[in-house]
Amino acid sequence: MARVTVEDCLEHVKNRFELVMVATKRARQIAVRGDQPMVEWENDKPTVVALREIAEGYVTADILDED
């Protein structure tokens, strides 16, 4: 399991504050709504999965406009 760094995530969002908002929303979608992760689960917590999805470019700030 590779570590997720803030720098990896910041390539896909504007700043660290937006990163927190995007990661929080995506983690809740996975944990509460039961959405399927876009990356392999690897026995991680939903917050780590959300950060991995952001770092790999699967999730962007556009998620904030949903719902």
Swiss-Prot record:
Q: What is its EC number?
A: 2.7.7.6
Database matches in InterPro entries: DNA-dir_RNA_pol_omega (IPR003716), Pol_omega/Rpo6/RPB6 (IPR006110), RPB6/omega-like_sf (IPR036161)
Asked if the record carries the keyword Transcription, the reply is yes
A single BP term in Gene Ontology:
DNA-templated transcription
Give the record's keywords alphabetically. DNA-directed RNA polymerase, Nucleotidyltransferase, Transcription, Transferase
User: What reactions does this protein catalyze?
Assistant: RNA(n) + a ribonucleoside 5'-triphosphate = RNA(n+1) + diphosphate
Q: Which domain of life is it from?
A: Bacteria
Q: Which GO terms describe its cellular component?
A: DNA-directed RNA polymerase complex
Which positions make up the signal peptide?
none
Q: Which GO terms describe its molecular function?
A: DNA binding; DNA-directed RNA polymerase activity
Asked if the keyword Amino-acid biosynthesis belongs to this entry, the reply reads no
Q: What EC class does the entry list?
A: transferase
Tell me how this protein assembles. The RNAP catalytic core consists of 2 alpha, 1 beta, 1 beta' and 1 omega subunit. When a sigma factor is associated with the core the holoenzyme is formed, which can initiate transcription.
The record's family statement is:
Belongs to the RNA polymerase subunit omega family.
Its function, per the record, reads: Promotes RNA polymerase assembly. Latches the N- and C-terminal regions of the beta' subunit thereby facilitating its interaction with the beta and alpha subunits.
- Xref: HAMAP family: RNApol_bact_RpoZ (MF_00366)
Its recorded name reads DNA-directed RNA polymerase subunit omega
Origin organism of this chain? Legionella pneumophila (strain Corby)
